[in-house]
Regions:
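Structured mid-to-C-terminal alpha-helical surface segments
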Residues: 1-120
Length: 120
């Protein structure tokens, strides 16, 4: 793990961060528990960068609340679009609707989990 460059003459700091698959699994767990707009947005961003993958699905199944990979049922209902705008528009330039984000996340998880749920 690389050191964080100190801003003064302190001991080197260390920062442990999750891998992309671990972050994807933890964000999916957060979505399961609270269905917050920021969780869906983060999952959408992870999906568009290819991080909703088999490894993330396995981590979610092993450490998440359902004891199984993410299923489409977890992504049935998008946040209200007004809430989506209110929560996120002040933080970033939204280029996706809540419904589009939900569909993207659901589709990426479906693809990622296919090899885990379909017999070979």
């Amino acid at each position: 793990m690389p050191d964080i460059l100190p801003t003064r003459e302190d001991r080197p700091a260390r920062l442990t961060v999750p891998t992309a698959p671990a972050f994807a699994a933890s964000k999916t767990t957060a979505w399961f528990h609270r269905a917050a707009t920021r969780d869906l947005y983060d999952l959408w961003a992870l999906a568009t960068h290819g991080h909703l993958n088999t490894e993330a699905a396995e981590l979610f199944a092993r450490h998440g609340p359902t004891n199984q990979p993410p299923t489409p049922d977890l992504f049935r209902t998008a946040p209200n679009q007004d809430q989506w705008q209110r929560d996120l528009a002040g933080q970033l330039r939204l280029t996706v609707t809540a419904t589009q984000a939900l569909a993207t996340v659901r589709d990426h998880w479906t693809t990622a989990t296919r090899s885990l749920t379909d017999p070979a």
